[in-house]
Design a protein with these regions (language model features):
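N-terminal domain-start signal
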Residues: 1-209
Length: 209
């Protein structure tokens, strides 16, 4: 990767890092005596919070998701190769595919669980799940969705969405790694996959207990 090509991105990322909650700000939120007090403290930071709306809806995740998406979109506009950002954001794409597949297989509307982040829009992913085809996503993603469908049609397992999207998330990471052919990306991808596997192992161990 050309360091000069990423100089503008580096500057933007440093600015965004400075907008992260400081230890003092986070502690101030944690010791708040009420939700309203916590939201008012958060409102004084870079997070855009409609205090009254959150108090009425009790839905806090959309605030965090919206902030994350703003930062993602800002970096996406500047980055020379979007594949680099995919290394970190493709997990949200596969999360959304899981949600949409489970919604399709179960007949339940679960779309509110989607996270508005990643290179591919909700409409694009929804069209992929509905038709098992798309001109706007990589072939590996289409292949994963088709395999999940085949498993569900053969065995009726809702878990097919989890099993195949997890598997193809790893495959997609490896594909990005091979395509970019950068040692630092290879190391990052290895660490990410190792951490996911460790998390899965710990979760499975706890469930057996």
């Amino acid at each position: 990767m050309n360091d000069l090509a990423y100089s503008g991105v580096n500057t933007t990322v440093r600015i965004l890092e400075q907008q992260l909650l400081s230890k003092e700000q986070l502690n101030g939120i944690l010791v708040s005596k009420s939700l309203q007090q916590a939201l008012e403290a958060l409102q004084k930071t870079s997070y855009e919070v409609d205090v009254q709306e959150v108090l009425e809806s009790r839905q806090f995740d959309p605030v965090l998701d919206a902030h994350l998406k703003r930062n993602y979109d800002e970096v996406l506009e500047l980055i020379p190769d979007a594949s680099l950002l995919d290394v970190f954001s493709i997990r949200y794409t596969y999360h959304n595919l899981k949600v949409l597949l489970k919604s399709k297989f179960s007949g339940k509307d679960l779309k509110h669980l989607c996270i508005p982040l990643g290179r591919y829009s909700f409409d694009t992913l929804n069209q992929l799940v509905e038709t098992q085809d798309s001109l706007d996503v990589p072939d590996i993603m289409i292949e994963g969705v088709r395999e999940a469908y085949a498993d569900f049609e053969n065995f009726g397992r809702l878990e097919a969405a989890d099993v195949f999207m997890d598997r193809y998330y790893f495959k997609h990471l490896r594909l990005i790694d091979r395509t970019m052919n950068q040692e630092v990306i290879h190391q990052i991808v290895n660490i990410m996959i190792d951490m996911e596997n460790i998390t899965t192992l710990i979760r499975a161990t706890k469930q057996k207990q």
